[in-house]
Amino acid sequence: MRGYLLAIFLSAVFLYYVLHCILWRTNDYGVTPMEMKQRNKIRSCLSKPAFASLLRYHQFHPFLCAANFKNTASFYGSDKFDLPYGMKASATHFRLALWKLPNCDIFDEFDNVPCKKCVVVGNGGILKNKTLGEKIDSYDVIIRMNNGPVLGHEEEVGRRTTFRLFYPESVFSDPNHNDPNTTVILTAFKPLDLKWLWELLTGGKISPNGFWKEPALNLIYKPYQIRILDPYITRMAAYELLHFPKVFPKNQKPKHPTTGIIAITLAFHICHEVHLAGFKYNFSDLKSPLHYYGNATMSLMSENEYHNVTAEQLFLKDIIEKNFVTDLTQE
């Protein structure tokens, strides 16, 4: 009889939890939409940013939240596009991954600095020997991407990282590269990217099948450090900033924005002033360094079929000439 009553009690507790999650749409960590809204309100500035004319939404929250991601997708039209530009046919993958993340905050709740001045640090070889590290570290927000290292390159690129965009094939797997003060942002290009994150968060086994190169097989970041980028940011980069066609000819591979352009688009939505470093490439010398680290050369960039580097360089030239951004490595 005692066991029977215990079973009824446990069932009631479980049912209460399920109903609570449904009614309040919380994630696994019990965060409600109202609490999310309070946390993620970006402090507005009295003046408009220089790049304001590029933005359709001036109070857009760039990270997905478990509590309301479906409503967000519907409101911004992301339910009509497949990845990497929307959530169509991938909502289940988003839900599973998001429910394992404790929050979707942009900045720390105690961060009261308004009108943030940001720098987006590319991985370009032009950063070699520039000694911009101290300058980069002086910004309110420092955005980096992929596996561009800080360790061993502090003089060139600084020590601090606020945000780092990544995808499964580009994320660090060496714990020496983990800064507990960094927020890492998954930029999902395919449903498998979300499945990869969910598997790592739940202790599952990762299969390399379906990735263009082997993804990280372990996660050096804690769940509280991880966010998932709203696909609207990638879609805006592709269609509104780079003006890519929605349908490519059959004889062409579809082009997608590089992580660098996506990072700049993110900066436009969370910063008041945006500076760039490391986005200039030397196409006249294919043997020149592609990155400020490693031995890769510009020849690899010229062989890339998935990005339109010419369109990206024209876009960068345009926003620099219009003083929408400042380029720290302009020569």
UniProtKB/Swiss-Prot annotation:
Glycans are attached at N129, N181, N282, N295, N308. Residues 26-331 are lumenal. It is found in: Golgi apparatus membrane. CDD domains: GT29_ST3GAL6. Keywords: Glycoprotein, Glycosyltransferase, Golgi apparatus, Membrane, Signal-anchor, Transferase, Transmembrane, Transmembrane helix. It holds the Pfam family Glyco_transf_29. Its EC number is 2.4.3.6. It catalyses: a neolactoside nLc4Cer(d18:1(4E)) + CMP-N-acetyl-beta-neuraminate = a neolactoside IV(3)-alpha-NeuAc-nLc4Cer(d18:1(4E)) + CMP + H(+); a beta-D-galactosyl-(1->4)-N-acetyl-beta-D-glucosaminyl derivative + CMP-N-acetyl-beta-neuraminate = an N-acetyl-alpha-neuraminyl-(2->3)-beta-D-galactosyl-(1->4)-N-acetyl-beta-D-glucosaminyl derivative + CMP + H(+); a neolactoside nLc6Cer(d18:1(4E)) + CMP-N-acetyl-beta-neuraminate = a neolactoside VI(3)-alpha-NeuNAc-nLc6Cer(d18:1(4E)) + CMP + H(+). GO terms for cellular component: Golgi membrane. Residues 1-4 are cytoplasmic. One of its GO terms (biological process) is cellular response to interleukin-6. Signal peptide: none annotated. Belongs to the glycosyltransferase 29 family. This is Type 2 lactosamine alpha-2,3-sialyltransferase. The lineage of its organism: Eukaryota, Metazoa, Chordata, Craniata, Vertebrata.
